[in-house]
């Protein structure tokens, strides 16, 4: 079974890491079947632009608390993407995350928190990204909706929870 093979390869019980590695296993397999050797992702956007509920919870602690959450989430994401690339390498595919480059991280951290999240009740978040999407012509239905993470939309999360 793929999930146990991945669990063994990445050697962690972290549910999110396992879910993401399973999802990218299939993404990489598909990319390879299409003769692609690189897949570019938007990983890092939620970490850098306050996309998680943890940022709502941290909001009352001000910028310093939000920065602390951001640094923790970025550290986890950078490590997880190494595991993802280990899985993708089976198909000779590289998963690239331009939003997790050190230069982009440095830039994103200069954007005011108020452009990312408005308050502790803000369910939409990532406002500057949504404004940019509108500006460049992304259809409204795409930039006004909350996104669903790959592991949830693909039902991997549910399947893994059921198998435990």
Regions found by a protein language model. Give the residues of each.
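Conserved S-adenosyl-L-methionine
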Residues: 138-148
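ATP-dependent adenylate-handling active sites, centered on carboxylate activation for C-N bond formation
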Residues: 1-136, 150-162
């Amino acid at each position: 079974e793929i999930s146990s093979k991945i669990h063994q390869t990445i050697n962690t019980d972290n549910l999110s890491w396992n879910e993401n590695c399973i999802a990218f296993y299939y993404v990489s397999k598909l990319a390879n079947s299409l003769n692609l050797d690189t897949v570019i992702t938007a990983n890092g956007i939620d970490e850098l632009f306050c996309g998680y509920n943890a940022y709502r919870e941290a909001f009352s602690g001000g910028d310093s608390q939000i920065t602390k959450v951001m640094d923790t989430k970025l550290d986890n994401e950078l490590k997880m993407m190494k595991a993802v690339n280990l899985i993708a390498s089976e198909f000779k595919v590289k998963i690239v995350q331009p939003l997790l480059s050190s230069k982009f991280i440095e830039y994103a951290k200069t954007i005011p928190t108020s452009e990312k999240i408005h308050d502790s009740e803000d369910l939409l978040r990532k406002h500057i990204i949504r404004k940019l999407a509108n500006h460049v012509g992304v259809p409204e239905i795409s930039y006004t909706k909350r996104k669903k993470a790959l592991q949830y939309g693909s039902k991997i999360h549910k399947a893994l929870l059921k198998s435990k």
